[in-house]
Amino acid sequence: MKRILLLIALAVSLCHVALAQETSSPDNFPPDDTSVVLDSTNLPIVWIDVDGKTIDRYERISARMKIIHNGKGKINYGDTVAHPGQHIDYEGYIALRYRGNTSFNLSDKKPYSFRTLERPLEQGEKKKKVSILGMGKDNNWALLAPYSDRSMIRDLLAFEFARPWMEYTPQGKLCELFLDGTYYGVFILTELVTQGTHRLDLPDPGEEGDELTGGYILEVGDNDNDTTHFVSKYHPVSGDGFVTYSDCSIFFIAKFPDSEDVTDEQHQYIQSAIDRMEDVFASKNYTNPDTGYCKYIDVQSFMDYQLVNELGHNVDAYRLGAKLYKRRNSEDQRFKMAVWDMNLAFGNCKHNQGSSTSGWVSRYNSMLYSNGDPHMVPFWWYKLISDNNYVRKRFARWAEWRNSNLREARWKATVDSLANEVTCCGAEARNSQAWPRWGIKVWPNVYISTSYADEISYLKRWITNRITWLDGILQYTPPAPTLVGDVNNDGEVNIADVTDLIDILLRGEADEETMQRADVDNDKEVSISDVTALIDIILRGNT
């Protein structure tokens, strides 16, 4: 088996090299239809001007960027001459390149990385921190290119599911992109999981003492010789823990400080910190509440990372792009996690059972090994889910998620809201004109949707079925349904509810759950018609 794995790994490596050779295109990978016209849109409009230069995957080039955004709910116009005075959200120099691995190699529509600059690269790189589309000031950004994700919202959906629970989750904004005057489609302008005042607020690590202990950002993933990495002392194990795959390794890649800036002392320290954490997980007493793994990881952070990735059944979770970060010991010596890259989640991947609505991704090492996939889940995830205390806490945490932003009405409203952004002013239609792919197989889709509405329906069905499976495994019991008209939630419908409803109307505000109960006629707004409906319910005794 080891020989087979090595041969497969070699073949994958050669394939990767062959793909990676096409790091650029003289025409910058244009869409199928380059004649798309944008008159007006609800989404921000991003113009990038490279003046005919070739964009590369690894080397950045100078470019100019301009973003028109007149504000949420307002229309942005593509013709700035006919519509002068529009709000320019950002205008300036950027350092631009392509980004991504499979999202670059296996997608016709390419994603970008850019840094905002004081001046063009030719005059000496000087980064400039700016706020873009309401996101906090920074100089490091990405333009994700939804392609295999036909909904174009899976990454944003995962971010919204995780945001109330995790210390940091990237913000992202849907937009429409022009490159040298050609329409390129719908993109997501997003923050990255990087160090920064408005992102992961980590200090620069020093060379000794407490300053050496933080901050750091690591990624579990590919061994890339162009980056600073180290290998785990411990090999991955099977989903039941009985088999150790000694011919497979787990790699940690330094993301902050990056390979150009990290010193030998810092590299040695963060490797030793990972070693200490893993040594504890490998010990017999790893569940000890005082000396065990709780001392080295923020359990709730790891749990929330697990819940959002398992909710999406993300085939890349834990093993490809998993982000860990650490502050200085004087502040918090524990590792925490952040969410990133879920465009293949939520039923959007055919391989590794990615479309299944059952099963734990954290237990997939046996399948990965059988498939010859060398990228495996670190052993400490098996150890975590083998701890009864962790499992009990996960039951409770899932219930918190389900009673909050994962209530059926709320998560469906989140999907609808994001989908509406894409469709309400024609952005999806323009994107489909530029990249006509409906009814055509795109890697690695399992469901070949024929329209945007079809894709969103599939997405909702898939999430519904996945939540049903997780509810059963995580022993979640939904609360009893609220009586229609029970505005004050006391278990009865009577004149007191009318009084409370009128009070809500007069004040014009209440918490979200109360507003939902106050929407008696279920028309998505609270108005005098709800008072009429409530009185009718009381008079008829129909609750």
Task: Set out the residue ranges of the language-model regions.
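Alpha-helical segments with a strong preference for the paired helices of cellulosomal dockerin domains
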Residues: V487-E513, N522-T543
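Sec-dependent N-terminal signal peptides
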Residues: I4-L14
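Low-complexity, Pro/Thr/Ser/Gly/Ala-rich linker/spacer regions in secreted
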Residues: Q21, S35-V36, G472-D486, D511, ...
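Calcium-binding motifs, dominated by EF-hand helix-loop-helix domains
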Residues: L311, L483-V487, Q516-V520
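Short, well-structured beta-strand/strand-turn elements
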Residues: P164-F178, N314
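Middle-to-C-terminal accessory/interaction subdomains
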Residues: S24, L43-P44, T54-D56, S103, ...
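Internal "kinase-insert"/substrate-recognition segments embedded within catalytic cores
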Residues: E118-L121, K129-P146, W165-P170, T182-L307
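Conserved NTP-binding catalytic cores of kinases and kinase-like/nucleotidyltransferase enzymes
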Residues: Q21-M152
